[in-house]
């Protein structure tokens, strides 16, 4: 197989060699559902949606698991603030998550396990770690992971225990043997709601965040997965802790390849609520269409930082219009399958096979669109649409996309175009130009060709 992926663990690009030939098992850490999804979530979902799409295009069977964290300190706090049950809050947020993902054209994962459905498996895993001397119960009732007893700790993030200890400025708290230790099981507190605690041999409590993913991943995909992914912010400590838990229990690698998508910034500053530059997916979709938002994410490489600004989104929409204009100009001939020997297709595939190189793949699509404009070849237009499908793009009606957001209805625009055509026929070019300029002032540009006049909306 020619597909190669950057492995965060080895810090090198490696060939993807599925442990089960022809079948890729991929686990991606999903959302903690206490609030609406933001642009960072959108980036992760789109990035791994492209991954699963390309794996399928490459002829592989994909079992894609993306979890939902539906029990967490933030969830408990928000539910109490809202005066609602944890279940009511998380159900509402999962519904919103699905609506946002559907709007962005994100295919559902094969499985979407929820943490609360796997508490017995989490307790079983904690028990195995305790038996191996990697976990202990603290005086406050919490069960913690003994980080220094796992020899491989820090291998994913490249952090040494000495570096981590030097950066630790707090005293040992809550009965931890070491400040680096992390919680596996949190003992219940008196003021917490009943739906935030489970019975266990350690007393009532709830699982820690890190043990949730280790248990769900192992239960659904086995001891070693082909790809484990998530945002760059999860690399440490979450994924480092997952490795310690899973590999500490099984003695086997948790994942063959670790993938991490890059951060999202706003005008080159880190996006955060405290800076007031934080945007939910719905904030963005209120101003930009979903396909433009998806294209904005895809045209940057998944590992690079993604800088969000109105100018970048405007540019993404105008760029996407160029592709749709080619498909509007020439009706695409449907392709039963892509001939990957075709030069444009071959270059697209080479880009995607090299660590999902979407910037290079998109560049090929623009070159192909230019060729469609020159040749008016329906087969090339069909290829452009088919390549777009590999990325979840260009599957809409070109006219609908190009004319979206018009300040006049289509019938009124058609009437003005007819008036302009009549003025040109009567050699009243001043009137024809006036109509063109009036429409342009409304954000509508006219394009004349031998086949007639068409219009589209400009940003």
Curated annotation (Swiss-Prot):
Localization in the cell: Cytoplasm
Bound cofactor: record note: Binds 1 zinc ion per subunit.
Record's catalysed reaction(s): tRNA(Cys) + L-cysteine + ATP = L-cysteinyl-tRNA(Cys) + AMP + diphosphate
Record-linked Pfam families: CysS_C, DALR_2, tRNA-synt_1e
Top-rank taxon: Bacteria
InterPro entries for this protein: Cys-tRNA-ligase (IPR015803), Cys-tRNA-synt_Ia_DALR (IPR015273), Cys-tRNA/MSH_ligase (IPR024909), CysS_C (IPR056411), Rossmann-like_a/b/a_fold (IPR014729), tRNA-synt_1_cat_dom (IPR032678), tRNAsynth_Ia_anticodon-bd (IPR009080)
Signal sequence segment: none
Broad enzyme group: ligase
GO biological process: cysteinyl-tRNA aminoacylation
E.C. number(s) listed in UniProt: 6.1.1.16
Positions annotated to bind Zn(2+): 29, 213, 238, 242
Binding site for ATP: 273
Keyword list, A-Z: Aminoacyl-tRNA synthetase, ATP-binding, Cytoplasm, Ligase, Metal-binding, Nucleotide-binding, Protein biosynthesis, Zinc
SMART domains recorded: DALR_2
Motif 'HIGH' region in this chain: 31-41
GO cellular component, one term: cytosol
Cofactor(s) it depends on: Zn(2+)
GO MF term list: ATP binding; cysteine-tRNA ligase activity; zinc ion binding
UniProt cross-references to Gene3D superfamilies, sorted A to Z: Cysteine-tRNA ligase, C-terminal anti-codon recognition domain, HUPs
Motif 'KMSKS' region per record, residues: 270-274
Entry similarity comment: Belongs to the class-I aminoacyl-tRNA synthetase family.
Classification via PANTHER family: CYSTEINE--TRNA LIGASE, CYTOPLASMIC, CYSTEINYL-TRNA SYNTHETASE
Name listed for the protein in its UniProt record: Cysteine--tRNA ligase
Organism: Albidiferax ferrireducens (strain ATCC BAA-621 / DSM 15236 / T118) (Rhodoferax ferrireducens)
Lineage of source species: Bacteria, Pseudomonadati, Pseudomonadota, Betaproteobacteria, Burkholderiales
Gene label: cysS
